[in-house]
A protein has these predicted regions:
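Acidic, surface-exposed loops and disordered segments
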Residues: 1-269
Length: 269
């Protein structure tokens, strides 16, 4: 159970904390009242810290974390819709990498931002395994290929591998796996997809190349997944729901944004 603490000496009774609480844990009867937790409702707190972030005076805390634990808005860094739209449109799945190693600090920067990717009920179930070594990525690709060779219609990929190529990770120097413990969340796949794509877009903004590692994820979710789990150090209850190749972009250069058809829409009014 979360512990919510109000400081009446600071509270200005603006009502913002009660307004933003998704679980309606704390309420006021009138505008003159101080906010207070509904009896027994603290068990429903999802520790989203919306109330703390909305308070203009730092008048409350959750689990001892208050005003100073929430980042300030950078009002000079306002992002226009056109900038976000351009980032999404220009993002490409990159399958040719420069061969240069990827610095750990860049991965750390990206994962630091991805902490704020939305998750169902603020469950924050997504964990990450980072394979950041060309030799280890190649080794993992070999484990995936052992599974792939048992699957139908994969002979073209097997042929590429046998000739020294990498049809699994395309020669990327780094592979990111996103996983959850499926005993703790019903929304694992969706939460992971959101987190991975957040990472993906942020990596694009850092001028890194990325590509979703679908073959790796298929293998990691297959009946023979135990071999991959053992290699990655995952338990039986943990599942890889998303994977990305990441690296500095090689010779793959685009002059324009590829065509996409109009969105299929159905309006109900």
């Amino acid at each position: 159970m979360q512990k919510i603490t109000f400081d009446k000496s600071l509270c200005v009774r603006c009502g913002q904390c009660t307004l933003v609480c998704p679980s309606r844990i704390h309420q006021r009867q009138t505008s003159k009242d101080y906010p207070a937790c509904v009896k027994g409702a603290e068990e429903m707190c999802i520790a989203c810290y919306h109330c703390v972030a909305a308070c203009p005076v730092g008048g409350l805390s959750v689990n001892g974390r208050g005003h100073d634990d929430c980042l300030e808005f950078d009002k000079t860094a306002a992002i226009r819709f056109e900038q976000i739209a351009h980032l999404i449109r220009k993002r490409r799945s990159i399958r040719h990498y420069s061969g240069a190693p990827l610095e750990d600090r860049m991965i750390e920067q990206l994962l630091d931002v991805v902490r704020w990717a939305p998750t169902a009920k603020n469950g924050l179930p997504v964990k990450w395994v980072i394979v950041n070594s060309a030799s280890k990525v190649r080794e993992l690709a070999g484990v995936v290929m052992n599974w792939l060779k048992t699957q139908p219609n994969t002979s073209p990929m097997v042929e590429v591998w046998d000739k020294g190529g990498d049809p699994v990770f395309r020669g990327a120097p780094c592979v990111i796996g996103a996983y959850t413990d499926d005993t703790t969340s019903h929304w694992s796949a969706m939460d992971t997809a959101i987190a991975v794509e957040t990472f993906d877009l942020c990596a694009t903004a850092m001028r890194l190349g990325t590509c979703w590692a679908g073959t790796f994820v298929r293998a990691a979710q297959s009946a023979e997944k135990s071999v991959i789990h053992q290699w990655l150090g995952l338990s039986e209850t943990e599942t890889i729901h998303g994977g990305l190749m990441v690296g500095h972009i090689g010779e793959e250069v685009y002059q324009r944004i590829p065509y996409r058809p109009e969105a299929s829409k159905m309006w109900i009014r």
